[in-house]
Amino acid sequence: MIYTTTDTIPGKEIAEVRGVVTGNVVQSKHIGRDLMAGLKSIVGGEIRGYTEMMTEARDIAIQRMVEQANQKGADAIVGIRFTTSSIVDGSSEILAFGTAVKLVE
């Protein structure tokens, strides 16, 4: 499966649009990470625990989006975008979305 943030794939031609595909995950914070985040916010610096959590969540969202594209018989996903939002206090959602397409063979 090819997936890209661009609207085209160099060297490939889109034969058919299979529709919008999405993948999302809601990730909650861990109390230990919250304590470290509080300390980091005082002294400054990257909060590695949250960075790792969001990277993992993004990977899961992409995986779910790719699974949906496979179910639609797509060869690729173009125009991928990501959004994040706070769902409830202590949790965040990452949504990945794009257009599933069939490529000319």
UniProtKB/Swiss-Prot annotation:
Positions in coiled-coil regions: none
Gene3D superfamilies (UniProt xref): Hypothetical protein apc22750. Chain B
A Pfam family: YbjQ_1
Superkingdom of origin organism: Bacteria
Family: Belongs to the UPF0145 family.
Name of protein: UPF0145 protein VP1283
